[in-house]
Structure formats: structure tokens, C-alpha cells
Amino acid sequence: DLIAFFSSPDLKSWTHLSDFGPMAATGGCWECPDLFPLQTPNGDTRWVLIVSLNPGGIAGGSGTQYFVGQWNGKEFIADDVQTRWIDYGRDNYAGVTFSNAPDNKRIFLGWMSNWDYAAKLPSPIWRGSMTAPRDLQIIEVSNALYLSTLPISELKATHDHSFEISSEVDSTITVGDDEEKIGLSLVGHGAVLFVAGLNYHNWS
């Protein structure tokens, strides 16, 4: 439940500057911190500290919280002690950001898994996937600053090829003496609705 800040003139000799925490969501291991500046809607600069937590996530298991505040070169001072989460789902952990992106964007990429079940995934070599890259921005809501995460605009290029489906397809597959009924409905009108059903031995 602690983030320690160090400085070094040569990346060999290190000097302890300050500690941050514990506060907000605690009770697990704090790891994978990331500290970076972002502009607020009125043009001021605030610093964001991202902290991954395991256990203690909002949805159980591991999760990622963040703090908005000031960095004076030696210590990080949060604006408040409110718990703020990057995600409210279970599958985003240990995320880091990339600087020097086009248009001065701050790009976030996380691990799409959770330590509650990561070791049980049916993959022999890897454990989970990476999240879609997101563009991080600071927004203001009710006089408080929050972190907004949106898919990067470059992902729109993957949506150039689209089509609409406005029909229903139902199929019956017979294997030996057993009958399996599979119903599939695809309806597209601005959005795609996917419905699937299975009836096997009168079970649906």
C-alpha cells in the first residue's frame, strides 16, 4: 500500500525522495505505478498516478486505481483521497502508458486478465491478452477531476468495412438419432444484435 519515489543522476545510484500512501483502495499489493502529466480542461497541468492493486479491485481480485494531484519534483500530493478506478470490470490490470505519441496523446495499455483466475486460463504459454489502447484525458465533473479513457482514434480504421444484416437464420442439425436445434438471429440497423439459442434433447 505504498509507492516510493527515487531519483538518480546515472540510473545507478539512487536517492529516496518520498513515499505516497496508503490511501483510497488498500488491503493488497500496490504495484506497476505510472506517473505522468496531463492538461485539465482549463489548460492547467495536473499529474496522474496510476496504481495497480491486488487484491482489492472494485470487481474482485486485481484492479487499477488512479490519483489526480500535483508533483513538485520530489513528492506526489493527491487532490483528495477518493478512490477512482480506471475500469469497473475485472479484466484490466498492470497498465502502463506511452509518451511521445502523436498529438501529445497519453496512450494506456493494460493486461486483460485478473489474478483471481489468470493461472487457470486454458493457454499453455501466455496468460491473457492486452487491452485495446486508450487515449487518457482529464475531465471535470462537479468540480472534481477524473481520468477519461477512450479507445484511440486510430482504431476507427478497423471499422471501415461494415455491413448490415436484417434477416433471421434458423437451422436444424441432425446427428444420428440425436437432434440439435440451433437458432441464430442477426439484426442490423445502425447496431448489430446477436442472439443465439441451442436446444439439445429438449434442453434450451
Located regions from the model:
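Hydrophobic core segments of beta-strands in well-ordered, beta-rich domains
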Residues: D1-F6, H16-A24, C32, F36, ...
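Repeat-based blade/solenoid architectures
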Residues: T26-P33, G89-A94
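Beta-propeller blade signature
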Residues: A4-D10, S62-K74, S123-I138
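Beta-propeller blade termini
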Residues: P33-P41, V96-N100
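Extracellular glycan-recognition regions
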Residues: F76-F108, M112-S204
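Acidic, glycine-rich loop-and-beta core segments that form the ion-binding/anion-interacting portion
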Residues: L38-P41, W47, N54-E75
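Blade-edge beta-strand/turn elements of extracellular beta-propeller
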Residues: A4-G27, F67-D87, A144-T149
